[in-house]
Structure formats: C-alpha cells, structure tokens
Amino acid sequence: MSEVSRYFDKQLLKFDSSKVNIFFTSDTHIAHENIIKYCKRPYANTKEMDEALINNWNSVVSPDDIVFHLGDFAWGGSGVWNDALSKLNGHIYLILGNHDMKNLRQGYMTRFEAVAFQMYIYIDKQAIYLNHYPFLCYAGVYRGENSAWQLFGHVHSQKKEISYETITNGEVKEILSKDESRLKYLFPTQYDVGVDNNNYTPVSYEQVKEIITYQQELYKMEKEKENETSKGSSLQ
C-alpha cells in the first residue's frame, strides 16, 4: 500500500477531498475491438482508442491521485493489462465488471490498490456506493440533499442518447440499447461514470458532485411541475 493510505481509512473507506484528488471512470475496454462499433467510439482501431483513453486519463489524473475504476477495464490477457497499468497515473481501485471476472486469479490484480465486487465509501461526508451495475434502489437514497449516491458503469449511456449497433453474422444492425429504456428510472443521485458518457475521460469528485446537484434540481423542478399539473386537473 502506498502513501495514499494516509488519506484513506482502510476500515471505513473514508477519503478527504481536501488532501487528495479523487476520480471515477468505468468501461474503458482497453484492446476491445468490438466496443468501438458497439458504442460508436470515434476511433479507427484499438491502438488509436487505447492511446486516446490513456492520454485522456493522464491529462487529468496525476501520479498521487486516486481513481476508482468501476469495471470492464480491459479485454485480453496479462500483456494488455500490464501494459495499460504501467502507463496510467494514479492509485487505482477496481470494482469488478462482467468482463473482469476471468482475471481474478491473475497476478496483475495486485497492481490495484484494492479489488472488490462493490465498495461503499465516504468522501468528506458524502456516502457513495460504487458498483459496475446501476441499482434499482439502495439504502440512503431517500434522504433529500443528504442522500447517498450510486456511481456505476456497464450501460454505456451517452449524454446524447444514440442507438447502438449489434454485429450478427457480419451484418451491422441498428437497435436501441437494451438498457436505454430503463435509465429513465434512475434516481437523480445516480450517475454513469463510464467513458462513453464522459468524453472518454475520468471525472473528478467535484465534477460528479456538480452533475448530481444539477440532476437533483431538475428532478425537484419536474416533481413540482407534476404536482401543479395534478392540482390543476383536480380543480376541473
């Protein structure tokens, strides 16, 4: 364990954002060729994609920063994983995604600060669930401004929703994401930190805080509008 442990309570998973920069990301899919077509990533091949993802990462993350990667780190074996990890800045915590499971017993997993199926952390006084998948519901979500957050990946959502492509027998077919219709049911305190949703770059704790605050404000406005509409209907 490195110097970063000074800012990390191992038992309670508490971090102090005034002493260390904290970032979140997910679904980098290093060396995964099909992900370029599936998610319409703007890269010609995996070499170009991997270089961009690593450069974007290191443009915001310094060697002493903390990064929580919420799964589906890379596609491939030890050569791919070790090469990518040797180039990335920061102390990385890995939440396992569905594509990471086969790598659990590999030696390069020790290069992460910690590896887990999920984590529950505090940054300052903010409680945060970290998972690869979005939750339908979770403890602490109904506390208003003090609600716990849940950060996730997996769904490859994008700020400007697009249709995804699937490859079947060499043919490319346009379809809607199987997860897309469900994302509207997320709480305003949930956010997809995956690279496809964040300009292929890790997002900082401060950025996530700003995004979730904005989502909460929108949610509040929508509820107030619904209540006004409901009142108007009842008077007719």
What are the roles of these predicted feature ranges?
Residues 1, 45-60, 90-107, 179-213:
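A short, conserved beta-to-alpha structural element at the edge of catalytic cores
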Residues 1-44, 186-236:
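Acidic, histidine-bearing metal-coordination/catalytic regions of metal-dependent phosphoesterases
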Residues 1-4, 46-48, 72-74, 108-109, ...:
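A short linear-motif detector with a strong N-terminal bias
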Residues 12-13, 53, 70, 85-88, ...:
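Generic detector of leucine side chains in alpha-helical contexts
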Residues 15, 23-25, 30-123:
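Core catalytic region of metal-dependent phosphoesterases/phosphodiesterases
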Residues 16-18, 87, 143-145:
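Short hydrophobic "helix-edge" motifs at membrane interfaces and signal-peptide entry regions
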Residues 110-222, 228:
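Conserved beta-sheet core of the metallophosphoesterase superfamily
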